[in-house]
A protein has these predicted regions:
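A glycine-rich, hydrophobic loop/mini-helix early in the fold
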Residues: 47-67
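Short, internal strand/loop/helix patches
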Residues: 118-154
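Short active-site neighborhood of thiol/selenol oxidoreductases, capturing the structured segment around
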Residues: 62-90
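N-terminal targeting signals for export/organelle localization
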Residues: 1-53
Length: 190
């Protein structure tokens, strides 16, 4: 009898641990802030991954070219006044990457022909940022559908991997501490 209780406790302990940890994780018993501070992931993943190759009109005309091993830091400009902060932080993050500066490409997308002049004027302040016209505006709709914030209002920085998949975006913040956390994320990704 004593051996059966001992055997049952040995066999049931791992099952009990797995069930308890699963419940703990799924019901979110711990504070979300505590979890976010102890992780390297400070961005928000898109609801589903989507590839930028789907936006190509044909094989000769592509929306964006992906170079080997280069990640893309991008912003979709719908309002130039809102995008200034994201462009500024994109440049600062790129410079802060130090030796990995050449592994990241900065891109700005826009689709509204009415703001084209304002966007060109704005990008003169941010050299080495490629400007891409999303002529039919499909990209902003896909970004909006796959994010938890209003991409038209916020104009956040988002990350595209070297294979053309949109991975995550960073919610806009004026807090320098948040951008230090974003820099840590980028260093892990790159």
């Amino acid at each position: 009898m004593k051996n059966k209780i001992f055997l049952a406790s040995i066999l049931l302990t791992p099952i009990l641990v797995v069930v308890a940890s699963s419940l703990y994780f799924s019901y979110g018993i711990s504070s979300d802030d505590t979890w976010r501070d102890n992780t390297k992931n400070h961005g928000v993943f898109f609801k589903s991954y989507f590839e930028f190759n789907q936006f190509n009109k044909n094989e000769k005309e592509t929306l964006i070219e992906f170079e080997d091993g280069k990640w893309v830091m991008a912003v979709y400009i719908t309002k130039p006044t809102k995008a200034v902060e994201s462009l500024k932080w994109m440049r600062r993050l790129n410079v802060a990457l130090n030796r990995d500066i050449n592994r990241v490409k900065r891109v700005a997308f826009y689709s509204n022909a009415l703001i084209e002049e304002d966007v060109n004027t704005l990008l003169k302040e941010y050299p080495r940022t490629d400007l891409i016209n999303d002529k039919n505006g499909i990209l902003i709709n896909v970004l909006q559908r796959n994010s938890f914030i209003d991409m038209n209002e916020e104009n956040p920085i988002f990350i595209i991997d070297p294979y053309g998949r949109a991975v995550m975006y960073f919610e806009p913040s004026t807090d320098k501490v948040e951008y230090k956390k974003i820099l840590k994320d980028l260093k892990v990704l790159i």
